[in-house]
Amino acid sequence: MRVFIINAYEDRKEKYDDERYEIFPAFWWEDIEEEQVAEYHFRHNARLDYRKKVVACSLSHQAVLGKIINEDLKDVFILEDDAIIEKWDRLKELKGCKEFCYIGGQINAPLMKDFKKFEDIKDSVRENFCKGINVIDPKEFRLAHACGYFIPNKRVAQDILSNIPNCKKERAIDTEYISLQKKGKITKFIYPAIATLYLPEAKKGFSYSTYKLLDDQWLY
């Protein structure tokens, strides 16, 4: 078992002093070239620094998947550096899982235009979740964010990588994963979340304004 933290900011390392975490150096956004940015799809009014951060994040996640493939790693947990694991004993709940499984994130409406309406029914959606591994129903909800997920082996990592991008131009990594939910390639999440947000850091993230992070997402 390995637990990788995709770490971009030096000052975020201090909360990962537990030796069970392994720091995976992220791509730094200022090193991203405009030619790389051009390969991605963005809203027309997205700022260049935001675009570079999205690309750096995506490349970092794909690099971890590549490491799993190249080194034939098994039972790998991938977290972003604004997420933490508080109950390590829960990792054993993934024992025997043979596919991609979210261990953290945020449930959202199937369509972005319904984001605000979904907030009113989110609790009723959660009532259908059971403790343990659940199945994503893309017609009812989607799982956003890529703050924490489980990859059991290199076959699954390769399957994910080979399906990115889903369209002609690549999207943010969590958007790519949402597309794979719709295709039935990503179908599982564990409830409640194992990886929760460390809000002081999460609220500084470049996607905060999009997702309005109000809690640690223990209940997604």
Regions flagged by a language model, labelled:
Residues 1-79, 83-220:
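An acidic/histidine-cluster motif and surrounding catalytic segment
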